[in-house]
């Protein structure tokens, strides 16, 4: 079949069809372009000689553009080799060359897309001169064209140089036959020399290999090839470049040994991170920020919408969002040590002071000592005012009897206050709670302590000051209340309560829940300790087969004590109405504060 062979070599002064092509490779139209050989623009493009095909393979062509072989289909009239002097006239008269289309050529080269034509499309062994260039359709030959020597990355496409991503290769495969199954990832192309003189596309060795799925180029990175191929300079057509094209693409950062993805990056701000801190790979800055925040229990406030960006450049702008991101990526607050000294210098923290009477034995001993110290000496009782034979007087009480009643109450209050201060744990309460407990339990403690010291069988009442009075001596001032106190004293003595049990019972009357306490939890803890101490003592009493029943009977006296307290308030109220003697301020205050409860 006769053919016409053409090669690049158009003189610089002769304009060619390439000048009419647009600079945008995306704007090139490959849909059946038509060429007229009779045109004056294409007439002088025929070279003087028609070299053989080996010229392309052995001539050492180093131009920038690829080499293509054009083969015209045979017609009824054979096509002879054209010369430079007769190409104009023969093209105008020959029926074979009168008009033909670009698709009638057999093209050996690299071009994107698929040219629709009756002939098979082929691929030549001379692919792109540099890796990753978007191959475009070749221009018609221009005689004596001298390509400029450019770097392998600065092609003639100018602003349309190949991008450094894999997206530019996507359009190369859009017109390939669709394969069944899920779409493959972006691929690289590798062209090998054809095995036959005119292989088809189905027979051409088109190698596809997927790009690394996890590798992404960072900012400022560039493509590079393995060390076996140090450069990608333009090579001659007869040089096999399939090895270079088949080599996987690696980045500069990948060659240095760092893996792709987020490994080696701070999970909070994206800065360099060498190891894990508090369960997450973070940088030193975010590690220190998280540690300081947890140790100081710092509270931050976001001035925006709590969605501030946290990166290497803006991580110090919003501390709230930075700490929230630390928690979101998985940093654990419990891992942070909070017992470290500031600067790891200074004195060790002092040990918390333990109360000296923490054990039940020590607590019981302290309660007994407090009770004995607050009571009168039985060997030195004051009988100076005691009168056993007193004639009963009928009628209203006089001012002397009322004043005696008020004096006995006021004197007991000072003694009870000193006794309470010796109870372990009482002085550790707030002053407000101490006053509230004393004023609320004063009348109950007055009755309990008086009933325990007195001798109801003899009618003797022994007060805290050591003063001994007969029941009849107190009848006008105390009224019927004194008889109820003596009855309570008989029942209390019938239980055989010893001093340790009575000391614990008195403390329980004082240390109890009251309305208006500032720290009721501490009062409850102290009450539980005293109750445990009383329970252990009752269980250790020898000769008692049922300590639980004895304890319940003892604690059953507390409701009776509350009833007697109410009767005492009623007596004070009656004396206030008679207004014979004004009550002391402390008694009046206790009455007014306790009456509402």
From Swiss-Prot:
Secretion signal span: none
DNA-binding region: 263-338
Keyword Acetylation recorded: yes
Location of region: Required for binding NBRE-containing DNA: 267-353
Region of interest (AF-2), residue spans: 583-594
Region of interest (Required for the interaction with RXRA), ranges: 298-360
Entry annotated with the keyword Coiled coil: no
Pfam families: Hormone_recep, zf-C4
InterPro entries, per database record: NHR-like_dom_sf, NR4A1, NR4A1-3, Nucl_hrmn_rcpt_lig-bd, Nuclear_hrmn_rcpt, Znf_hrmn_rcpt, Znf_NHR/GATA
Keywords tagged on the record: Acetylation, Cytoplasm, DNA-binding, Inflammatory response, Metal-binding, Mitochondrion, Nucleus, Phosphoprotein, Receptor, Transcription, Transcription regulation, Zinc, Zinc-finger
PTM remark: Phosphorylated at Ser-350 by RPS6KA1 and RPS6KA3 in response to mitogenic or stress stimuli. Phosphorylation of Ser-350 results in decrease in NBRE binding while phosphorylation of Ser-340 has little effect on it.
Sites of Phosphoserine modification: 340, 350
Cofactor, free-text remark: Binds 2 zinc ions.
Induction of the gene: By nerve growth factor and during liver regeneration.
Segments for region (Disordered): 1-22, 341-360
Cofactor: Zn(2+)
Effect the entry attributes to changing residue 350 to A: Loss of phosphorylation
Region Required for nuclear import, annotated ranges: 170-465
Residue intervals of every NR C4-type zinc finger in the record: 266-286, 302-326
Superkingdom of the source species: Eukaryota
PANTHER family reported in the protein's UniProt record: NUCLEAR HORMONE RECEPTOR, NUCLEAR RECEPTOR SUBFAMILY 4 GROUP A MEMBER 1
Function per UniProt: Orphan nuclear receptor. Binds the NGFI-B response element (NBRE) 5'-AAAGGTCA-3'. Binds 9-cis-retinoic acid outside of its ligand-binding (NR LBD) domain. Participates in energy homeostasis by sequestrating the kinase STK11 in the nucleus, thereby attenuating cytoplasmic AMPK activation. Regulates the inflammatory response in macrophages by regulating metabolic adaptations during inflammation, including repressing the transcription of genes involved in the citric acid cycle (TCA). Inhibits NF-kappa-B signaling by binding to low-affinity NF-kappa-B binding sites, such as at the IL2 promoter. In the cytosol, upon its detection of both bacterial lipopolysaccharide (LPS) and NBRE-containing mitochondrial DNA released by GSDMD pores during pyroptosis, it promotes non-canonical NLRP3 inflammasome activation by stimulating association of NLRP3 and NEK7.
Family: Belongs to the nuclear hormone receptor family. NR4 subfamily.
Name of protein: Nuclear receptor subfamily 4 group A member 1
Source organism: Rattus norvegicus
């Amino acid at each position: 079949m006769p053919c016409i062979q053409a090669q690049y070599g158009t003189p610089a002064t002769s304009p060619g069809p390439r000048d009419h092509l647009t600079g945008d490779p995306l704007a090139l139209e490959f849909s059946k372009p038509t060429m007229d050989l009779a045109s004056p623009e294409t007439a002088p493009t025929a070279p003087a000689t028609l070299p053989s095909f080996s010229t392309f393979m052995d001539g050492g062509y180093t131009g920038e553009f690829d080499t293509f072989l054009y083969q015209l289909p045979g017609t009824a009239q054979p096509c002879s080799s054209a010369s430079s002097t007769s190409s104009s006239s023969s093209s105008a008269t020959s029926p074979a060359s009168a008009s033909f289309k670009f698709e009638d050529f057999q093209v050996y080269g690299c071009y994107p897309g698929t040219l629709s034509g009756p002939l098979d499309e082929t691929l030549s062994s001379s692919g792109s001169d540099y890796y990753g260039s978007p191959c475009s359709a070749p221009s018609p030959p221009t005689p004596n064209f001298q390509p400029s020597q450019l770097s392998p990355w600065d092609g003639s496409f100018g602003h349309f140089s190949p991008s450094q991503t894999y997206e530019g290769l996507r359009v190369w495969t859009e017109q390939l036959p669709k394969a069944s199954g899920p779409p493959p990832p972006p691929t690289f192309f590798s062209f090998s020399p054809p095995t036959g003189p005119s292989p088809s596309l189905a027979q051409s060795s088109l190698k596809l290999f997927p790009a690394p799925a996890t590798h992404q180029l960072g900012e400022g990175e560039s493509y590079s090839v393995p060390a076996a191929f140090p450069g990608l300079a333009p090579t001659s057509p007869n040089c096999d470049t399939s090895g270079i094209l088949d080599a996987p693409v690696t980045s500069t950062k990948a060659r240095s040994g760092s893996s792709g993805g987020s490994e080696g990056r701070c999970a909070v701000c994206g800065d360099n991170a060498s190891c894990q801190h508090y369960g997450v790979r973070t940088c030193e800055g975010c590690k220190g920020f998280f540690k300081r925040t947890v140790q100081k229990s710092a509270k931050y406030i976001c001035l925006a919408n709590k969605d501030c960006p946290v990166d290497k450049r803006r991580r110090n702008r919003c501390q709230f969002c930075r700490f929230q991101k630390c928690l979101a990526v998985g940093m654990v607050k419990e891992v942070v040590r909070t017992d470290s000294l500031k600067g790891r210098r200074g004195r060790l923290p002092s040990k918390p002071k333990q109360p000296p009477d923490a054990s039940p034995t020590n607590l019981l001993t302290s309660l007994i000592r407090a009770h004995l110290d607050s009571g009168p000496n039985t060997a030195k009782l004051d009988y100076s005012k005691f009168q056993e034979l007193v004639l009963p007087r009928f009628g209203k009480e006089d001012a002397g009897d009322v004043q005696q009643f008020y004096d006995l109450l006021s004197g007991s209050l000072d003694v009870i206050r000193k006794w309470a201060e010796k109870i372990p744990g009482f002085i550790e309460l707030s002053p407000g709670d101490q006053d509230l407990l004393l004023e609320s339990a004063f009348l109950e403690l007055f009755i309990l302590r008086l009933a325990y010291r007195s001798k109801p069988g003899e009618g003797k009442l022994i007060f805290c000051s050591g003063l001994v009075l007969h029941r009849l001596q107190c009848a006008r001032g105390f009224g019927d209340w004194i008889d109820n106190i003596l009855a309570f004293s008989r029942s209390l003595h019938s239980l055989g309560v010893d001093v340790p049990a009575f000391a614990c019972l008195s403390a329980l009357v004082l240390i109890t829940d009251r309305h208006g306490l500032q720290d009721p939890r501490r009062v409850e803890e102290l009450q539980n300790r005293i109750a445990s101490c009383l329970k252990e003592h009752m269980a250790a009493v020898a000769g008692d087969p049922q300590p639980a029943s004895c304890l319940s009977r003892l604690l059953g006296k507390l409701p009776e004590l509350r009833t007697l307290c109410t009767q005492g308030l009623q007596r004070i109220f009656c004396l206030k109405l008679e207004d014979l003697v004004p009550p002391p301020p402390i008694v009046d205050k206790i009455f007014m504060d306790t009456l509402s409860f």
